């Protein structure tokens, strides 16, 4: 057997020098173990350290204007719960963390920050695009959905759709194709630019606000928005979402965009 290096005690030598036998050490260890078990039974075990607090900041998760199951069967309850409380919340948490060192940007609304994305330092620009964009996009998405939908575009918005897309059927076809045909993750939008309407598509969580457009309707085509129910049938999901659009809300956003 190899001997330990000179000057290093073996366990037996250390116990001998301390005047402690291996047997007594074993009994002592057993006593500690029994005491520890007794502590656990008596509830005297120190509490686990609390997890670090979640980063706080300017953004909080908005409540929905309807129950999680209100959009069924088009969007199922579980998808809504996960989408809202986990995915949307994650964008908010990461946005607040990103802006913690930049309080001047936290004073801006998400929309104004995205409109001024060129002022954002390069070190946080991608995080702002992804997370502040994700927050703003989802706030709009939740707002323009309603159980059973809300009729059809009417008033100034309805007239503008007929003017800019020839007719409503053409508009519905174009936005449906933009949503279903978006490669990878992203969004399809109805957006206002110079008081005219455009159907556009953006990747990931990029917002039309970054390019000077004002979005008034958005369709989320990230897989987390539909995969539990529709799997790879994105076109079916897009059609279902179209039946939930709250055209009263979209019309109000259009009026604000052309008059604000």
Model region roles, listed by residue range:
Residues 81, 89, 128-150, 216-234:
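Short, contiguous alpha-helical
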Residues 177-231, 237-245:
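An amphipathic alpha-helical core segment
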Residues 236-260:
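N-terminal targeting pre-sequences for secretion and organelle import
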């Amino acid at each position: 057997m190899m001997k330990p290096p000179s000057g290093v005690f073996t366990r037996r030598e250390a116990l001998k020098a301390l005047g402690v036998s291996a047997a007594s050490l074993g009994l002592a260890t057993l006593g500690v173990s029994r005491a520890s078990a007794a502590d656990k039974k008596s509830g005297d075990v120190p509490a686990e350290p609390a997890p670090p607090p979640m980063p706080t900041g300017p953004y909080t998760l908005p409540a929905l204007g309807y129950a999680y199951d209100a959009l069924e069967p088009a969007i199922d309850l579980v998808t809504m719960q996960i989408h809202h409380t986990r995915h949307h919340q994650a964008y908010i948490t990461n946005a607040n963390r990103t802006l913690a060192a930049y309080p001047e940007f936290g004073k801006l609304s998400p929309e104004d920050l995205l409109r001024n994305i060129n002022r954002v330092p390069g070190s946080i620009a991608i995080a702002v695009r992804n997370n502040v964009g994700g927050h703003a996009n989802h706030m709009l998405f939740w707002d323009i959905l309603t159980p059973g939908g809300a009729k059809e575009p009417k008033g100034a918005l309805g007239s503008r759709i007929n003017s800019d897309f020839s007719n409503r059927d053409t508009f519905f076809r174009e936005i449906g194709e933009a949503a279903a045909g978006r490669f990878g993750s992203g969004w399809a939008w109805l957006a206002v630019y110079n008081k005219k309407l455009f159907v556009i598509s953006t990747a990931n969580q990029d917002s039309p606000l970054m390019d000077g457009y004002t979005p008034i309707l958005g369709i989320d085509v990230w897989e987390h928005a539909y995969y539990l129910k529709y799997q790879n049938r994105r076109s079916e999901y897009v059609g279902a979402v179209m039946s939930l659009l709250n055209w009263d809300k979209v019309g109000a956003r259009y009026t604000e965009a052309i008059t604000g």
